[in-house]
Amino acid sequence: MINFLTKLLLYFSIGLAPLFITSQTNEIQIKFIGNCGLFMTDGTINLYVDFPYKSGAYSYMEYENEEIEQIKENAIFLFTHKHADHYSYKLLKPFEGEKYGPWNVEELKELESKSLDFQIEPFRTEHKVYGISFKHYSYVITWHGKRIFLSGDTGDVEVIKSLKELDLAFMNPWMFMNLQNERIPVETKMFGIYHLYPNEKLPEKVPSNIIFLKEQGRQISISYE
């Protein structure tokens, strides 16, 4: 895997500017919880992506119970699919708030009527396990004019290769591999590589425009005007 990740660094670091900025007042703050689990906030809207999930499912990342205890009231919950390393009905059920996933993506349009600065666009993407297809969506969040892509578990590159002017693209390693194999550039300022195994070995030198999300609790900030 280390050779694969090193090649990815060389391929995706060409001609891209860093995005990690923390000096501005107006920021979208992003916290990496584990797997594809993220918490995002601008101080008004609180969004959880692929969280809560079953801690340690399929030998992926565990997390402390305090992550559940700290979930904000009336947050928005967004899920790419229902596999246990991304979603837990049992853990999600007690929380109020708006909950979106493959079962009701058409309702995401209602968010546009509530805030001109926050929209989520769903894209049906392929996800197969042992040849069996599962209902799966990737998303583009447009927030204060900033565009954030969320791959989830898909390796399907048809959506990402058509997207323009992304500020941050969260991707799993197998999507990276498919993009490299097909020599497809991605129009984004920053990559966040997530859904790594806890024991994943990473290159020692990493370009500033690529973040390997292995350290749980890692913070990313995107400034906006």
What would you call each of these model-derived segments?
Residues K54-A57, K82-Y87, K114, K128-Y130, ...:
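Active-site environment of divalent metal-dependent phosphoester hydrolases
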Residues E106-S115, S133, E182-E225:
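Binuclear metal-ion centers of metallo-dependent hydrolases, dominated by the metallo-beta-lactamase
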Residues K128-V186:
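Active-site-proximal loop/helix segments of hydrolase catalytic cores
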Residues I2-I45, L202-N209, K214-E225:
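Zn-dependent metallo-beta-lactamase
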